[in-house]
């Protein structure tokens, strides 16, 4: 159980470390740097969705023969629809590279800062679920999930959480909030990951046979975030290939981690 708890906290540590950048850097991240970091995060999430979630989901359903894809197919779509629903219900704000704000979700009287944090929190939910379901598979003896593979996913999510923590804390500081407050708000945006990770472990204990569905559910939710949010963000502004290059770096790094440790 100690291994599970540590694994669930590793991604949160990445967010915390990234938010701490507000104490070391003196100004807001440049648009090119933001595109690079967003592309990197997208690459990690796509690779994690494929190698750590969808592939194990299909492998665990091999008893179905040629229909082994069905649990992964169904879980993937449930994940997409779940995030689509949250995206339309939770009031949140997307900040573009050109500093314009795009409000999504139900109308509310929430402050701009809260909605910005909710935007990051929204896509931290599937990341926490992804780590939680993999560690649940490890805990309940899924043959296709190893301790190394679970650690690889946790480390990969932590690595891509580092820039996310910086991207939330530094703009808040640039807008006039104190460094400590900006840091803690950045940390708060990542606190949902261990919470949803723990909840996923508990849910999985009740429905162990549904593990392939849970794995692909997390993958669908993560890929929704990539396509709906991260890819558009890394492509904003003047034409640049920096986002694509760092997407490839993030993808290859996560793939290497999964194969080497898994």
PLM regions and their residue ranges:
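Intrinsically disordered, metal-sensing/regulatory segments
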Residues: 1-262
